[in-house]
Amino acid sequence: MAVPKKKTSKSRRDMRRSHHALKGSAYGECPNCGELKRPHHVCGSCGHYDGREVVQNASA
């Protein structure tokens, strides 16, 4: 079984884990209705994506 030759210092351990943090979700404004929506997703409020209506009656 593989065993480390040297002890990993707290500094090196923490530097390795520096990329493990959760990142916040990115949101943008829908150009059609102005509601917040995820990038590259259909707007949940009006059903528009890329300048055209994709979903009929999204909120109604």
UniProtKB/Swiss-Prot annotation:
Signal peptide: none
Compositional bias of kind Basic residues: 1-22
Keyword Chaperone: no
Pfam families to which the protein is assigned, alphabetical: Ribosomal_L32p (PF01783)
GO MF terms, alphabetically ordered: structural constituent of ribosome
UniProt-listed GO biological process terms: translation
SUPFAM superfamilies: Zn-binding ribosomal proteins
Xref: InterPro entries: Ribosomal_bL32, Ribosomal_bL32_bact, Ribosomal_zn-bd
Alphabetical UniProt keywords: Ribonucleoprotein, Ribosomal protein
Region (Disordered): 1-27
Entry-linked Gene3D superfamilies: Single helix bin (1.20.5.640)
GO cellular component, one term: large ribosomal subunit
NCBIfam families, A to Z: rpmF_bact
Cited PANTHER family: 50S RIBOSOMAL PROTEIN L32 (PTHR35534), LARGE RIBOSOMAL SUBUNIT PROTEIN BL32 (PTHR35534:SF1)
Family under the similarity heading: Belongs to the bacterial ribosomal protein bL32 family.
Name of the protein this chain belongs to: Large ribosomal subunit protein bL32
Provenance organism: Rhodospirillum centenum (strain ATCC 51521 / SW)
Name of the gene encoding the protein in the UniProt record: rpmF
